[in-house]
Amino acid sequence: MKPTPSDWPRMSSSVFYQDAVAAIQWLCDAFGFEIRLKVEGDKGQIEHSELTYGEGLIMVAQETPQSERAWKRAMRSPKSQNGATTQSIMLFVDDADAHCAHARARGAQIIEEPATHDYGEDYWADRSYGAIDPEGHLWWITQRLRNPPAK
């Protein structure tokens, strides 16, 4: 048996929001994600969703601080934590500048303008920008310009 289902990447992240319905719509509109699955609870809240970007996948859900399950109580939006975040999410795109312009027009807070980062001829070069989504999650949007040479 393969350890990973055929339609899943080996690693994925879960991102929690106070308003997961609005977050999913925003992530699709601003960043270009597509909804693969959305499971709504009896009050319309998002219990689970899967959003794809190319072959990448993230899960988005409603934060539930009153949940009976300890892990669900622990998962919070930065908006619930005075804007504090302890991680970022990296997304590779085809054109970082065009993606930034599109995201900015849809309300992304750009915290670092697109810039080229060249780590030398033995390494890679990227063009990337940093953005904060409406609930405070930090995103690094990156375009690979050059791969490291084959060894």
Regions found by a protein language model. Give the residues of each.
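Short, surface-exposed ligand-recognition loops at beta-strand->loop->(often short) alpha-helix junctions
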Residues: 15-19
